[in-house]
């Protein structure tokens, strides 16, 4: 995923939320995405862990 991609994010206890990627930072353990959400337009950081389905919080929006 890259900047300006539309995505969904997993949050605590609720349904997945739609947003837009503002920034991407890669690390050896995974990738961090700054995602703009309706109630957080400046963005919230989410971390996708490498090789862990449970640690995947950001996914591309299915069209």
UniProtKB/Swiss-Prot annotation:
Protein name: Protein DsrB
Matching Pfam families: DSRB
Family: Belongs to the DsrB family.
Alphabetized HAMAP family for the sequence: DsrB
Domain of life: Bacteria
Species in which this protein is naturally found: Yersinia pestis
């Amino acid at each position: 995923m890259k900047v300006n991609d539309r995505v969904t994010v997993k949050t605590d206890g609720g349904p997945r939320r739609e947003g837009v990627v503002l920034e991407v930072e890669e690390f050896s353990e995974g990738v961090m995405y700054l995602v703009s959400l309706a109630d957080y337009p400046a963005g919230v950081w989410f971390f996708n862990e490498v090789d862990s389905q449970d640690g995947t919080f950001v996914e591309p929006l299915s069209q």
